[in-house]
Amino acid sequence: MGSKGAERRKQATPGQTPEGNVVMSFSFESYQLEEEDCQGKDISDKGVLALSEPAFEEAVPDDRYHGIYFAMLLAGVGFLLPYNSFITDVDYLHHKFEGTSIVFDMGLTYILVALVAVILNNVLVEMLSLHTRITVGYLFALGPLLFVTIFDVWLERFTIKQAYVINLMSMGTVAFGCTVQQSSFYGYMGMLPKRYTQGVMTGESTAGVIISLSRIFTKLLIKDERKNTIIFFVISICMVLVCFILHLLVRRTRFVQYYTSLARRGLSHAKDHSQHASQYQVHHDVITEEGNGAVGCSPAGDGCADFAGGNTYVRFDVPKPKMKRSWPGVKDMILHRYVVARVIWTYMLSIAVTYFITLCLFPGLESEIKNATLGEWLPILIMAIFNISDFVGKILAAVPYEWNGTRLLFFSCVRVVFIPLFIMCVYPAQMPMFSHPAWPCIFSLFMGITNGYFGSVPMIHAAGKVAPEQRELAGNIMTVSYMSGLMLGSVVAYAAYSFTASGSSFHSQTGYNFTQGY
């Protein structure tokens, strides 16, 4: 733990102005008075005192044992785990709601509500505090999980039609809460070093892997479907609670408070912060002062006091009063977002295009890939390969490489090649061009890696392209782009699903694990 800068009054240090006037500086916050070189300057120049940010004699906090990084990884797990919990018990859903498209309807409900939530969160970013939004998000995510587990799965209080509607409503509530968390966390991570954004995004992929393993083991160990589903949901609830408690603990750590306070004061991260640290200085300017040549000072604005005694001026420095932040007007909010979007627009398009292409294919079109030998296991295998490779891609995003925004957008668009490749794995229905099961597995592997990588890199780098005080807003704007890509991809996938489902009875007779890797 670093020691704070001494806040005792330093011994007065005199400074000489070009006209021979003496300036005495008494500092209460480790400020220094420096004399600026005045050689070669016109003798008529006046001395002006300038105030900039204080230099804090505080050691940069360290993420000892990578505990903060691990907590942020679990944060990514926490805000996608409730959604994955509803989707991953696909066997229970298909058995209970036989002959319906419950999994697909829940996925579409999630995307549509999530888009509304991320836009609303973007509007409220200046109105509600960061941690208020995250806490509310956790409560909205946990509530439906508890309600469905107790009243629908355990007590079975509803009819089939009622349960269907309640599950969709629960998914919508989860979507709202989880998306508010997600959008807020991206803004939160924008204030921390880049690796923590990568940690959160890796956690998103980890959520799909963890919840899939949880469902596999509960189903293998407990044969009764209702009991293993209850235990599955209880495990999910406990994991979300752990993530929530970790968030409450981590937000109070010195590491997080140090970096978030830097960002809110408009300073860079620690290594840049040391370069910007400055003191009171005597600057020479051509601005005309009072007739007696006094050094100008604004007592009300700078919290200083001048005492004229001959040609001697004494300045006492006191901390600036904190100003209460008022809510901005609509025009200001639009202007703030426009200014940020002008800087990061290539990153916004990159992440939107990446997830649009992925959602066009996953899980909709991939679930239609059939094979006589592997049967219904092929789509499950393809989904598993995608989730694992997506996880690997997000880990690779941690490798330091400075991407140019235009190149990043180009490579994100190149991924469109996966669309015709997967179509050739499905059509023509009687004999697809890529009929061997290895082909869709290979395509899914590369699609997952590129989705994880190009879905993470724009989010990681975008916050570093704007001023520190704009980083939380940049993270929220990037999440709007991210969710826009998901929504547009889901709409296209829904059209493809309706088209293929009408001509195939195979899909209606089997249930697949549509665990989302995004």
From Swiss-Prot:
Residues 1-21 are annotated as: Disordered. One of its GO terms (cellular component) is plasma membrane. The keyword Transmembrane applies. Disulfide bonds: none annotated. SUPFAM superfamilies: MFS general substrate transporter. Pfam families: Nucleoside_tran (PF01733). The chain crosses the membrane at residues 67-87, 100-120, 134-154, 158-178, 199-218, 230-250, 343-363, 377-397, 408-428, 440-460, 477-497. Residues 88-99, 155-157, 219-229, 364-376, 429-439, 498-518 are cytoplasmic. The keyword Ribosomal protein does not apply. Functions as a polyspecific organic cation transporter, efficiently transporting many organic cations such as monoamine neurotransmitters 1-methyl-4-phenylpyridinium and biogenic amines including serotonin, dopamine, norepinephrine and epinephrine. May play a role in regulating central nervous system homeostasis of monoamine neurotransmitters. May be involved in luminal transport of organic cations in the kidney and seems to use luminal proton gradient to drive organic cation reabsorption. Belongs to the SLC29A/ENT transporter (TC 2.A.57) family. This is Equilibrative nucleoside transporter 4. It comes from Danio rerio (Zebrafish).
